[in-house]
Amino acid sequence: MITVLVLNAGSSSLKASLYRLAPEIGATAVRPPAPLWQGLLDWGQNPTVARLKVTTANQHYEANLTHPEGGIAGLRDWLKSLLDTLTSGQTKLLENLAEITIIGHRVVHGGSRYQAPVRVDAQVKAAISELSEYAPLHNPANLLGMELMADICPQTPQVAVFDTAFHAQLPAVARTYAIPYELTTAGIQRYGFHGISHQYVSERAATLLQRPLAELHLITCHLGNGCSLTAVKGGVSVETTMGFTPTAGVMMGTRCGDIDPGILLYLLRRGWTVAELDRLVNRQSGLLGVSGVSNDLRQILAAIDQGNPQAQLAYDCFIYSLQRGIASLLPALGRLDGLVFTAGIGENAPGVRRDICRGLGWLGIELDSTANEKGQGDRNIALPTAPVSVLVVQTQEDWAIARACGQLLSLPISS
């Protein structure tokens, strides 16, 4: 058995999970096990105070951690405190951190050079740093997580698993923007994101449908605060809605998705700065911007119940954006065997699933209202007679990263 620690390091939070698995499980396991331990550090409200939460099968622990400086020094101390809960106290699972066989990291942007998980070395770190220009909110935090873990567990190998890797085989017509080609060759192209999630749920969908993934044409819908849709043909991503950055595509919680680029030129001419435009498209738009209420769909639905017309408009725009996004992926597939919903909204908002599917009846989509509203777990919520399956699948990105680590360890090490 191997012990895998999975880290998802962000700019204001860090999530971690611990799994034990046999090396060959990466290629054979279908239904993911629950993590043995889950940890969270959240310093989003105050850069000098982190909220620590740890959960195991039968224990839960919370604490507030403070550091006078915050920043990297604070995170280093907080991460050590988080990992201490693995080796001491009521959540203890390990005698020492040396029992961790391998550490897997989610990395948002791998550009065009990383099409599979890789062992982290100096060259990989340098590349992730270079790609920070493409993902300034994510890659630096991902890289910092690697650096800190190298200090804490210097003998433990680390693996980078890239969110862009699943989309690395996008055909040229899907990844190329209609801009001068020298810009394309300079790296400005559609990369796609949420790939770890899209790949996992497409594989899980094939298991639920009891059909080979190689013969399925699926659209996977990762709907959370960030949203993206992907056309998966025979297990390969052939089109996706996010692009050069995670700002593109469908309407999201705070991101605008696709808009006329002339809007940004117009605002630049009116004196807006690049930083202001960045905040506009990434933090002030989407459901939050249109509703004026929140990026949280639950609060928008509550506002709708209170008769707020702006909240209703935001919801309607969101549903329409997703319907249009789904339809836009059909040419890449030719036919549709299954529509897959995942992530926070996709898994937990039956009303959203219902309203999206209401506009897609022409595709052969017919929901079983009972399965949609009251069903639990991974399931098919389409009517048995419907020609297109509609699946709800709980995304398991941490497990997918752990599995990738297991697969990498089972490969022979080249000299």
Swiss-Prot record:
User: Which regions span the lipid bilayer?
Assistant: none
Q: What is its EC number?
A: 2.7.2.1
Q: What class of enzyme is it?
A: transferase
Cofactors per UniProt?
Answer: Mg(2+); Mn(2+)
Catalysed reaction, written as an equation: acetate + ATP = acetyl phosphate + ADP
Where is the protein situated, by its record's location annotation? Cytoplasm
Q: In which pathway does it act?
A: Metabolic intermediate biosynthesis; acetyl-CoA biosynthesis; acetyl-CoA from acetate: step 1/2
Q: Give the source's domain of life in one word.
A: Bacteria
Q: Which Pfam families match?
A: Acetate_kinase
Cofactor detail note: Mg(2+). Can also accept Mn(2+).
* Entry keyword set: ATP-binding, Cytoplasm, Kinase, Magnesium, Metal-binding, Nucleotide-binding, Transferase
Can you cite an annotated GO cellular component?
Answer: cytoplasm
Q: Which positions bind substrate?
A: R106
Site description Transition state stabilizer, residues in chain:
H194, R255
User: Which residues are catalytic?
Assistant: D163
Positions binding ATP in this chain are K15, H222, L223, G224, N225, G226, D296, L297, R298, G344, I345, G346, E347, N348
What InterPro entries does UniProt report for this protein, alphabetically? Ac/propionate_kinase, Aliphatic_acid_kin_short-chain, Aliphatic_acid_kinase_CS, ATPase_NBD
Give a GO molecular function annotation for the protein.
Answer: magnesium ion binding
* Similarity-based family: Belongs to the acetokinase family.
| Subunit structure comment from the entry | Homodimer.
Q: What does this protein do?
A: Catalyzes the formation of acetyl phosphate from acetate and ATP. Can also catalyze the reverse reaction.
Q: What is this protein called?
A: Acetate kinase
Q: What's the source species' lineage? A: Bacteria, Bacillati, Cyanobacteriota, Cyanophyceae, Acaryochloridales
